[in-house]
Amino acid sequence: KEVFFIVYFSNLISANICSCTIESAKTVTLLSGNTLGIEFSYSGLGTLVLEDTASLYQSDDSVVNTGIINLFRKTKPILRYDYTFWSSPVDNQKLIDVSPNTLFDKYLSFDTAGGWKEEPRLNNMLLGKGYAIRGPQEFSITSRAVYEAVFKGIPNNGKVEIELGETDSFGVVGNPYPSAIDAAIFLKKNNLKTKGALYFWMHHTPVTNFEYNSDDYAAYNLVGGVNTEASYSGVNEIIPDGKIASGQSFFVISNAFGTIEFNDSMRILGNNNAFFKPSKAGNFPRSNKIEKHRLWLNFENSKGAYKQILIGYMDEATNAYDLNYDAESLDGNQFVDFYSLIDDKKLVIQGRALPFSESDFVALGYSSTIAGEFSIAIDHADGDLSAQTVYLEDKTENIVHNLLESNYKFTTTAGTFLDRFVIRYNIETLGADQFKNQESLLCVSVKGKNIILNSTKDVMKEVSIFDISGKMLFNTKTINNTEYQIVNFKSSDQILLINVVFDSGKSAAQKIVFH
């Protein structure tokens, strides 16, 4: 139906209509969390007010609006010196009108060649472009508060294009519509134009007694999203779920010089509340159910240093590096970085091929400016991985740990470590990937309750024995011989994995049946 508002209306809720006209000097308020879907145009001389998280949804790129909206957006709690990344959902929005009390030189845009630059605050915000604006000058520098911005103007609709820089350059772009958009459709529409990941800068308030905070980039690609703060920390941050709210901007990395496109096929009903607060300095179908099996891992210490990664098995991903399915870590955290590895790529999100196999394994690496105790833990999992046993192999300590049973704690020096950890799903695969050509170095036999080891070429340095659950049953580091016997080994009848480290640094692993 065509709807005409000739009186004030203060409590409009979700509705789908053909067109909307508001009479001069009249105001219609769409309540928070509701969506007004309009098939054709919005017009009239009145004003449509969209409360925070409300949405104006249109799906036809050819529709031209002439009516005015006032769209309100609330930030996460901020300090005076915090910057929020904005984009405009209306035409001809001036930067100063987003935050009138911000200092004149604290309105920034991102130049792909030179980084952040001061933007005259009387400039209009370009459609699809992202801007960083500091908090109002009257805001506290110690106590955070929510800031509410208002965007006034004709609501944007239809195709919006914005130019990216040369390959591997950063760009800051943003949702140009008064409704949320689907990040997966955005990435598919702009396939090969970007590296296939979106990055949202997050700033965290350190919790009392925490020595380190976790300022970093939350990331999202077609596999999923990762957060930048532990759930128990007291910082209520959002894991990117593929819904980008109106007014929100974000980083992309160019894969080729050219333009990226926003259009109405990306717009979605509702889901207009995932607004991130950053800080200092063809036609594609709607996202249908896709087979995914995902594992989120946390790397952290007891003082607040934290990094999360995601490993996911899904359609169209491969075990090689793939745009849209693998997202590189931007190493925005000044204390720690944690990643999975494909060749020389350090990945915060890694997509892997289906079907999932328990014989698969994933190498992990980390960097730390902090020495001391850390832990690696499963944050959560879904699909087949929600019930899958997950082992963490520590190659430095020769330990295989079942992460379903408990977090794995270890100590580290400061530095970068690319060859310490491996994720596995089956203890029987331990050693098969790296030491498959080393079996001839080792001969293992069982006589009675005695396990006898003989090395054909190298001196044995260390022996570890694991059961099939990954539990270490035996370890010694004082062999220094080519022969070694474990007398009267205490074990039930079961399959055991024998792992040997030689003086040369090589390793070998063999399975035995102990009875």
Regions flagged by a language model, labelled:
Residues 125, 137-490, 502-515:
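Compositionally biased Ser/Thr/Gly- and acidic/asparagine-rich
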Residues 65, 111-113, 135-137, 254-257:
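Short acidic-glycine loop/turn motifs at beta-strand connectors
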Residues 55, 90-92, 136-138, 177-178:
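Short acidic/polar capping segments at secondary-structure boundaries
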Residues 113-116, 120, 397-398, 505:
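Detector for glycine-centered tight turns/loop "hinges" at secondary-structure junctions
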Residues 23-113, 151, 159, 164:
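Acidic, glycine-rich segments characteristic of secretory precursors and extracytoplasmic regions
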Residues 1-63, 117-121, 128, 135-143, ...:
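Extracellular beta-sheet-rich ligand-binding/adhesion modules
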